């Protein structure tokens, strides 16, 4: 059993004793903690909290515990049940609620679940709020309601449709062009909530030909749910058979979007955001943001339009903070996460699909041809395992000193920008390791510079 408590929420494997896994005792504790925090921080007069969940097998159990606890804390619960992460985020603002809890472990296997915590803006808690959650949980500073002040319960299953309504209302979503293009689309929804909302989205976008793979929301994931090439053999083979113009693949909570070209070749998750940004910038010039570990291609595309690109620390809340500070019109993360402020400040695969199909319809190209129009970069992802007694921060400081003549960014680990490549070093918050991401114009060059930096780290660790 595993239970991980962090500033972004609580996640773990289902079962075990108190503090060992994600079980009812720990769910009650952290729901109570969140309810206590939101009571202090919410500026609204609302007494509502929204609860949504992906299709995990444990979801119904976890939801029932969360809902009962919130009512016991005096909160009025709006249960939107099976819903994507972006749907739940939008529901918070549409309801005028004080916050929301999303029950999803994102791309983790079916034995995992988690509580992801939202503020009154439908955005994830910041670091200070996350730390306060951990403090309240440790101190067990809870105050439950008396019998006359218990919260109420309301189920509302309209938010999937409301989410789609909001996507279709976006100025840059060109439904007429998509209908005219008569696309054939394949989808893999890994037997979670994407299987509910993606077919409805595509139908309302005017896509008449949809090949559905793993669209039953049973929570029995048909493959590893992270939308990476090594896990997507079935839909890649379907595409090689010439059955569709493009394939969309989402993770269990539908905040990440991967795509597959008409020839069965992966589009590249780093290029989901790059492509959508190209379309957005063409029509609404402005700044862009992605995290330090994302492809340089977004910077290149942004500069093509004479706009400014900025990098944030890794993590959605950090990307959103930087986007607000720089008035970015589009941003996100290189794992297929598209954040479009005209919709809301959260990664949203539905927005990504609608904008991508609009762009594809306007360009009149095959998906593989569109992909070829963007700068070719390759990212290598590695790690250096260290012993617990080694001072990781000291090693990162020494690496920074060694490469002081290069462009350095140290807002999140150390990123070294060379003229034609980069390397990003980040320490793990939970393990004695350093993650090493490197990018260059060929995979060989990316691996080479990554290995060079890893050799430096290993040499420093021996001293």
Question: Can you name each region flagged by the protein language model?
Answer:
Residues 13, 113-240:
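Gly/Ser/Thr-enriched, mixed-charge loops and adjacent short helices
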